[in-house]
């Protein structure tokens, strides 16, 4: 939530300055976002690395699930140190008209994560099965590769790259503008985040069947909602670029068209969510009771989408 709000502020404000072709200010915004994301990343790393059991108790009281969660978080915590930095780089690629490179980095990371999950969780190529710890290790390696690729891409001509000396320079006016963009998004994200965290916590305390069904439903929801996230990200950048360039009329036109497109996509995603339960149940192993929970969750999530 905190990282999403910070990178959203970077996208909104940065897109406008890219429209103006004000690279100096864009460098300052990039450094500011890196500082904020770095602080947030360290805080979450400390919480997950040193207090994983207390975090898991928020979501479940099942000893088995807590043990799995603790094993996962102690390794995955290191990936949280990198996530904020890599996401800032990827957002900078998007707003500076290098969305293809950003997509390439993200796609490589996702494919690598899937392959490593299969290898580490189940065991392959001489590597023993690591179960939950394998999933965490796969995530960590994928995040390392993602950040390395993002940094390497940033040194190509026409890309915005981090200037280390600017990390320690604070622009008060720019900080205020950044918080004006990020603050409302953070507030909205916190409200939604608290809601979904509470929801997950309730599911976890209902037992393993409910927790398993909720885990599957959350993954499917996130996959289907990727389209919505992509449209909203593109809308903010496209409109921001035009506003920064002074093309107010074109920016308004883009905004209206993308708003209409989002409504159509919302309907499509709702239908997909509503009809996908039988297909998902065919591919995952759940108890009969967990299957019932999953179908009910899909109905609720379809209405939410």
Residue locations for each model-derived region?
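Helix-terminus/linker motif at the lipid-water interface of multi-pass membrane proteins
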Residues: 56-63, 119-130, 190-223, 241-242, ...
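Interhelical loop/hinge segments that connect adjacent transmembrane helices in multipass membrane
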Residues: 132, 136-139, 148-192
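Small-residue-rich hydrophobic transmembrane alpha-helices
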Residues: 1-45, 83-102, 200, 213-277
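Short runs within selected transmembrane alpha-helices of multi-pass transporters and secretion channels
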Residues: 4-7, 11, 76-95, 102-113, ...
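Residue-level signature of transmembrane alpha-helical cores of multipass secondary-active transporters
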Residues: 37, 76, 102, 106, ...
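Short membrane-interface helical motifs at transmembrane helix boundaries
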Residues: 43-74, 268-295
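Alpha-helical transmembrane segments of multi-pass membrane proteins
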Residues: 63-89, 220, 288-305
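Membrane-interface helix-loop junctions in multi-pass transport and translocation proteins
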Residues: 111-148, 277, 292
